[in-house]
């Protein structure tokens, strides 16, 4: 073999090796939705995450978004290697993880009362369960893998009139419904109210301007979205969790080393208490007079109503039955005395 041919082959081999190294060392682009963009709490948590992942050999480049539709679309079209957004948007990439953010699925009723601490314990155990390597199959759909779950807080009913204090009084009222979560409109219609098309960029504006009578939102949104304007002197926030919301991270698995998704989920599981601290601070920041409480009878009745609605919506194909089955098991682990734990509801689907 001639020297020139040998050198040529060596050159090609070197180019292949260097290309592989360059590809491995390229920064991974993360699109991060936060209602406050790059100044928000989630974005700040993600900066710490990036430092932690660098120790695992992955260098992350963050880009903040205030519109999660744009963030998820940039991810879907390959402009980002990973995205963080609410479960409503991430559900298109993994419906099992998206089952966390479903009507009443994580709510615990104990001794006839809503147990909010117990409800968050369900979310904690779910996040721990899905952080396990054994859950990788459930967390993966095609090239997409859920690589983090972060609690955002309970979605509470927020109304512009305190007289709207029962389900019956919501009949005919206008309620914001996200276009990309079809289950919301289904539920609103079930109670005889009127769904008004909205998304995360404008639902608060519609409430503050009086275009809708009710929205559901976590307390973390109260100050940034200036919800006090819509609540005014006559409105309030009902201390009844319609669901507990989560931020979720999903990656394109082809862009990351094997096993990265598990390491990432484990990291975010370790940040649960940090996220809860932010939620508790936001809860404490709501003026005491703004809160409204349901009777124990109605709290239990509405929880059962949400359960019936959740099952119906799952039968319509809008919720993932596998995910709901996992959540049922964890609810019954947290509160085994609940009568539902003696039934096969949400376990044996027909």
Where are each of the predicted segments found?
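Sec/Tat signal peptide C-region and signal peptidase I cleavage site
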Residues: 21-26
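Short helix-initiation/N-cap motifs at beta->coil->alpha
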Residues: 61-73, 179-182, 194-209
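Bacterial N-terminal signal peptides that target proteins for export
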Residues: 1-12
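A ligand-binding cleft/hinge motif common to bilobed small-molecule-binding domains
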Residues: 84-98, 204-208, 216-234
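Extracytoplasmic "Venus flytrap"
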Residues: 27-47
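Bacterial N-terminal signal peptides
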Residues: 11-20
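Contiguous mixed-secondary-structure segments that line small-molecule binding/active-site clefts
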Residues: 76, 88-180, 185-190, 227, ...
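Alpha-to-beta junction loops
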Residues: 75-88, 174, 194, 209-218
């Amino acid at each position: 073999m001639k020297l020139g041919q040998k050198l040529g082959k060596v050159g090609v081999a070197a180019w292949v090796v260097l290309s592989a190294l360059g590809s491995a060392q390229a920064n991974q682009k993360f699109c991060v939705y936060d209602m406050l963009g790059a100044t928000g709490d989630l974005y700040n948590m993600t900066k710490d995450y990036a430092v932690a992942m660098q120790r695992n050999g992955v260098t992350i480049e963050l880009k903040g978004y205030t519109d999660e539709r744009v963030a998820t679309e940039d991810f879907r079209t390959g402009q980002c290697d990973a995205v963080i957004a609410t479960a409503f948007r991430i559900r298109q990439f993994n419906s099992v993880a998206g089952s966390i953010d479903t009507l009443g699925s994580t709510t615990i009723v104990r001794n006839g009362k809503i147990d909010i601490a117990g409800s968050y314990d369900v979310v904690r155990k779910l996040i721990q369960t899905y952080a396990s390597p054994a859950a990788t199959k459930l967390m993966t759909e095609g090239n997409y893998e859920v690589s983090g779950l972060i609690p955002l807080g309970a979605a509470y009913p927020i109304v512009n009139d305190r007289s709207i204090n029962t389900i019956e009084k919501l009949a005919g009222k206008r309620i914001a419904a996200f276009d990309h979560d079809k289950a919301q409109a289904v539920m609103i219609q079930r109670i005889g109210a009127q769904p008004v098309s909205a998304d995360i960029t404008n639902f608060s504006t519609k409430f503050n301007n009086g275009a809708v009578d009710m929205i559901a939102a976590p307390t973390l949104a109260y100050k940034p979205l200036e919800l006090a304007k819509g609540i005014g002197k006559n409105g309030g926030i009902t201390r009844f969790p319609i669901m507990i919301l989560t931020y979720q991270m999903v990656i394109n698995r082809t862009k990351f080393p094997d096993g990265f998704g598990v390491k990432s989920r484990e990291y975010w599981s370790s940040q649960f208490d940090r996220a809860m601290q932010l939620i508790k601070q936001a809860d404490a920041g709501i003026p005491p007079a703004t809160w409204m409480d349901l009777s124990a009878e109605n709290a239990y009745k509405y929880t059962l109503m949400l359960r019936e609605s959740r099952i119906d919506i799952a039968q319509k194909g809008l919720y993932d039955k596998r995910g709901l089955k996992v959540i049922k098991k964890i609810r019954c682990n947290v509160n085994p005395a609940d009568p539902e734990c003696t039934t096969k509801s949400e376990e044996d689907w027909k």
